[in-house]
Amino acid sequence: MEGPPTAAHAAAPLRTAVFLALAASWQQPAVAVGNWNCARSTDDKQWECVAKRKDGGADTPAAPGPKAPPTALGEAALSQSNRAAPSTAVSPPTGAAPVAGTGLRPPPPVPSAASPSPSTMAGGPTEDEEDEESESAESEKAESTAAPQVAEGGSAGEPGGTPPARAPRPETPLAASRFVPSGTVSVRKEAASPQSVAAHAPGAPAGWTCKPQKESRSWDCNLVGPDPRGVARPVGAAGEPPEDWAQAATITEYDEQRFDRLLGMMPSNPWAGTCARGKRESDAAKDFLLTSKDRLARKRAPVEVHGNYGEMDDQEVATFTGDAEVTRYDQHVKGDFLSLNTEADTVNARGSVFYREKGLAFASDTAFMRMEEDKGVLRNSQFIVETMPSRGVARVAHMDSDTHSHYETATYTTCPPGNTDWMLHADEVTIDKETGRGDASHAWMEFKGVPIFYTPYMDFPVDDRRQSGFLSPTFGQSKVNGFNLSVPYYFNLAPDYDLTLQAREMTSRGPLFGGDFRWLTEHQRIRLLGEVIPEDSQTKTTRGQAGFDAMGRWTDSLFTLVDLNYVSDSKYLNQLNNTLGLVSNTFVQSQAYADYTYSNGSVRLLGDYYQNIDPSIPTEQTPYYRLPSLRGNYNEQIGDSGFRFQANAEVVNFGHGGNNVKGQRLNIRPQISYPIQSPGSFLVPSVALQNTTYMLQNQAAGTGSSLNRVAPIFSVDSGLVFDRDFELGSASLRQTLEPRVFYTYVPKINQNDYPIFDSNYYDFTYYQLFRTNRFAGADRLADMNQVTLGLTSRFIDRDTGWERLTASLGKVFFITDPSVTLVNPYGANPLGVVLGPDQGQFVYGNYNKSYANVIGKVDTRLTEAFFLGGEAQLSPYTGRFERGSVGLQYNDRQNNLMNLSYRYREPLPNQPAIEQAATIGQNTTALNNTDISFRIPFLKDWHVIGRWQYSLLYNRTLESLVGLEHETCCWRFTVLGREYLNGVNQSNAPTTNTAIFVQMELKGLTRLGDQVDRFLYRAINGYRMPNEDF
């Protein structure tokens, strides 16, 4: 083999970063012939040549020309859309047979002068590039006209002339691997829209493979993967029509292949977290917004270029091939071929193009970028929004600036690659990151391959910023309301306040109108909401509810709350809505208070009021309101003496709407204690003095308007802590044994003339055994001369710190029988329950007994997800459990839940026995209920949801709920049916209501109906809202 003539310019591989200050020429050994750069192959049997170029390529490489096939196609028949551009038969270079084992092939033919010009080919250049390409073409034409014929078999002056048939051997043997990436020979026409044909070794990038025919007069070419010219098509079977992906208005199979490759080039799969088990809702896509710091850093960042092969023309256009990449701050452009114009600051890329910036990633056939202006055009592009995550395709994507872009023939979804359960299609989509809005023209929704919605225009958010517009409608069906549809509209009035108006139509009741106003200030969060039915078609009355809520944090020490509520009637909350989140259907509380805290204590100023919404309850049994109430506490160590001083004080004005006794109460309780503590024991003796004074009105005859009560309170609290470490199987545990003794003495004081404004029994549990007063509030001070014995044992996992098992047992022993009762001399207690003369002696579960019930409590965490707990009170006199509860919960913190519980409570005296079937609505404190609730998975992506509350006391179901939910990482559908007790009629017979809830959510786009999540949050213990952390 003889070498070519003298070199015209040099070329060399580029394997390190190349900056904009690229040298005019590289002095690496190479040879050139006319319009070709040539180097010897490694086996020294052929030449490997690359055509010279002066331009940097174009946004859109040329499409195939007319459907004239090459002279021969070889064994595999190519579809018309996969054929190479028209060729002129030429003789291949001498000795250019394929080299066994290397995959190297000689250059293919170059189109003749009859080939279409770039400007007339499909996917031609954009207007911004036409001038540049025109100038490049004219200079090439002039150069080719003046060029002499340099070798036999070549075309003198022809830009795409073939390499020389034979050439003199260079004086020094050259290793081709130093100049051309192994396994690749590329030939590029020297026109503005280059065509690229290449042969590939196994594992090499896709492209054309060309072989000379036996007569060596023409070429047989075969396409592997996407066409490097930028109009790639998957190669189909013979006779199968090709997929017209370039005009497709959906996500095609070829797009899915591109998405797979795009994911492989990203640092991580953005759907990994969203599609993980338990992830309920996509995160807000706001991390793709450039901050001012990002913009400045991008402008100042240098441009870095990497590639396996590079070449510079006239110190202006740098060309790179072989895994080429351009980087500037967060922007990365990667492709098989890159050209960088240093004067125009433009980048052209083609062949497996990959572009990535903050929060966004693109794959495309071609990319034209103006780096300084943050502009670009990508054709046949696939994109991924990493922070949603979401993805889509656009046949043409225009990046107009760093905040604005628009897309032609676009498809969008939040489903991961390979899943197209739902897709949003549009002729054109515009995204404005600055405003957080997008719009689409001629948009239509497709779900499971079925079109379900069309609109000529739609406006949508692209991040979590608040925007005015319609919110997701809600709908449902119930027995008492009929079918109801609610349509809310949101007004983003200002950055610190907004308004939501709602229109709701119920076929059985008529229209309902509501509003919700929110205002956020520097120190306060204010909310005003209300609903009204102008005329309920069933009750023929105006019904509604209203609420005002204001929370303020004025300083680190001062906090305020105002919570005002109004409801028209007691049935409104069950029948229509409980927007206020109220827990009582009898009394509606409104309150306001201000808290001031400091290092040694706190002060609270409070006022409250109770609205009676149940007409069956007389006014006399309505709770007292406090207007105002001032309460404070103080706690401080007295120097180094070891003593601690505590004080509690309260002054309250109690009012009432009826003729009940009213008045003011002042209560002061100072206390001194001397705590002694060590790691294994504690001893806390203390003494307190409680002074209570009343100023009364409407008092009973013969009772003074001023009452005063003073009593000392002595107590000693002591305990020991023993522990031991041991192994149980593979678990390392620590067991503690904690005995506790608590003694209390309070002398007996006659309090029969004292009113009961706010006192009541504590909920009797294990921890109430260690209080110095068995009554809540200051109206009653219990006489106490008793000892409480308690024992607690814990099993602690030493590796995790979890309490695997905690068991406690306690009992009160009376030294002197208690006698102070909760009898109200004025006929009613704050809960509206009239107490008879033999009631009120409710002492730790017993009446006029010398011994209280034995209380036991057990909590165990079987695993991280399983929890079992229970508590019971056993009467030593009757041998009956007078009170008890047990519950088993499974919660894997992924909203897979199951709750099993049972509650039992004996009635108060003079109430029906627990064994008797009481009538619903009768005043009784007895309970005998079971409660089962769950949300458990079955099959793939399916959950069954349910709840069943059953009263063994009334022998009937209190509430039943059943539903199904299908959830994937991009959509969720839920349907629920519910039946529940709605109250009682005039004859005390129970009434029920049934309702159906339906919710459809396309994650990251929209939701139809939002009542299901809010209802399940209240109905199933442990359930979390989609946007709530576990």
Curated annotation (Swiss-Prot):
Residues 78-91 have a biased composition (Polar residues). It holds the Pfam family LptD. Residues 126-137 have a biased composition (Acidic residues). The keyword Membrane applies. The keyword Nucleus does not apply. InterPro entries: LipoPS_assembly_LptD (IPR020889), LptD (IPR050218), LptD_2 (IPR045659), LptD_C (IPR007543). One of its GO terms (biological process) is Gram-negative-bacterium-type cell outer membrane assembly. GO terms for cellular component: cell outer membrane; transporter complex. Residues 50-213 are annotated as: Disordered. HAMAP family: LPS_assembly_LptD. Together with LptE, is involved in the assembly of lipopolysaccharide (LPS) at the surface of the outer membrane. Belongs to the LptD family. PANTHER family: LPS-ASSEMBLY PROTEIN, LPS-ASSEMBLY PROTEIN LPTD. Component of the lipopolysaccharide transport and assembly complex. Interacts with LptE and LptA. This is LPS-assembly protein LptD. The lineage of its organism: Bacteria, Pseudomonadati, Pseudomonadota, Gammaproteobacteria, Methylococcales. The gene is lptD.
